[in-house]
Amino acid sequence: MTQKPIIVAGGGLGGLGAALGLANKGRQVIVLEQAPELGEIGAGIQLGPNAFHSFDYLGVGKGAREQAVYVEKLRFMDAMTAEEVAHIPLDENFRERFGNPYAVVHRADLHRELVKACEDHDLIDLRVNSMVTGYDQDGSSITVALKSGDTVTGNLLVGADGLHSAVRAKLVGDGPPRSSGHSTYRSVIPVEQFPEEIRWNAATLWMGPKCHLVHYPLSGWKVFNIVITKDNDATDVVAGKSLTKDEVRANFDHIHEMPQQLIEIGQDWKVWVLCDRAPAENWIDGRAVLLGDAAHPTLQYYAQGACMALEDAVCLSEVIGNNPDNLDAALIKYRDTRLVRTARIQIGSRQLGDNWFHVDGVHAKLRNEIMGNMSAEDYYDHLQWLYGHKASALAA
């Protein structure tokens, strides 16, 4: 008897990663993307070594590496004094320790690599204009409802449909995500317009009272990505809203003039109010399962949102490949393998923002002293749990 396809709701990085991993295990996959074409909004993302472990497992390691910019260090600056607090070398010692590099990449460049790999795979069917609104299931199959009125039936539904997941709405039913109160402003500018005095080959983070600022090069050093965040108790959840430079500047008039340059050189500023959810244990409903932001949306302070979705994709593919005739056991193994790690990212990201990046006064002085007294090996030890993780090994 022909095996029913696995349905993936969402054509983002996590959804396409899951499609590739499952197809590489011999499963037919249908990807349902709500947008009229497959693409990614947003700009830069940071990729730890754990992301490259996932790319290699999924068969896109070479393409991902070709799109990446390999920064020399993670650089932490005091936004009030413009002094370096600490840096983490990302050299050969780092790569030897964690088995892979640290890099930054334009989200759209990376997404194109995954789309191409899916398009080239005989077992993957990519469908656009296919917004998932819900599902029904019996003991042997699951039927997905689309906004168009059409339905698609398969063996399993993977809800990789993001922060506002329709699959999660039915599976968990916990309402809208919660606002963090943090507003993030984004801009991408040509590299020649970026100030030479801070045009570093680094992923740089400026830490200040109730704010932080990040910048790094992208797309073969053609542009710089600027992401600045203010804890301004924002309550109205917006995504990609345009605003003026004056509106951005008003949130950062208390910091040193050197990082303030980022606001002045930025163009076409857009704002997002960051949202997440508290960790939830119920990722599974019969033949429906959650992945990525649909399962464990997180704030950006660990720079691990995309990495966690890719790890999910690897883990889910591995457990289903290892349990081809026992879907229930595979899904339980997937959830139990991923739950605590992703919860650590969710909870830890909030704590990093509130209790480390955004502090002032004596708290900031203590932070700077602790960070400044740590060696490269100290940082590597501290990050072992994060960057040394191989999702495929733990799923075996």
Go through each PLM region and give its residues.
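Conserved N-terminal helical subregion
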Residues: 2-6, 23, 48-190, 233-251, ...
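A structural signal for isolated positions on well-ordered beta-strands in alpha/beta enzyme cores
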Residues: 7, 30, 125, 225-227
